[in-house]
Design a protein with these regions (language model features):
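Macrodomain-like recognition of ADP-ribose-binding/processing modules
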Residues: 1-151
Length: 151
């Protein structure tokens, strides 16, 4: 039996647009167990593609991330290297955004990239995804949306 993804009450509230209908609705679930056919699990890793821990390990174990591949589409996942510094991470996010723009048939579920083992705050990482928010096929964690919309 396939396990269902888990949304918190707050995530479900945002997904309706909130009381005023103005909150972003493209929210990822807190826990991702499964992906639809067109969904891609977006995670942070290192440039060497050593997917030891965190979302990188989940991507490797569950969604086809390739050992030794530090960036790009791999199976049902997309790796963004985050361990090599803010400047290189920002460039990798730009490449991801361009890839998502070129593949509107895919739905990208962006985890809190860079906010785990890489050690960045949401205040540092979320603005890197500002251009991606213009794409209907990119879904972000609620923590990123809160920074981006000032909530």
């Amino acid at each position: 039996m396939e396990r269902k993804n888990i949304y918190t009450d707050e995530e479900r509230y945002w997904m309706t647009g909130g009381n005023t209908g103005t909150l972003p609705t493209r929210i990822i679930p807190s826990v991702i167990y499964s992906l639809a056919q067109n969904e891609i699990f977006v995670f942070g890793s290192n440039a060497m593609g050593m997917h030891h821990l965190g979302a990188a390990r989940v991507a490797y174990n569950e969604f086809g991330a390739e050992w030794g591949n530090g960036e790009g589409l791999q199976g049902k996942s997309y790796s963004i290297p985050t361990m090599e510094g803010v400047v290189s991470t920002r460039l990798a996010v730009k490449r991801f955004t361009q890839y998502a723009r070129e593949h509107p048939e895919l739905k990208f579920l962006v985890t809190p990239v860079g906010c785990g083992i890489a050690g960045y705050t949401t205040e540092v990482m979320a603005p890197m995804f500002k251009d991606a928010t213009l794409l209907e096929n990119v879904f972000l964690p609620i923590s990123f949306w809160k920074v981006l919309v000032g909530k």
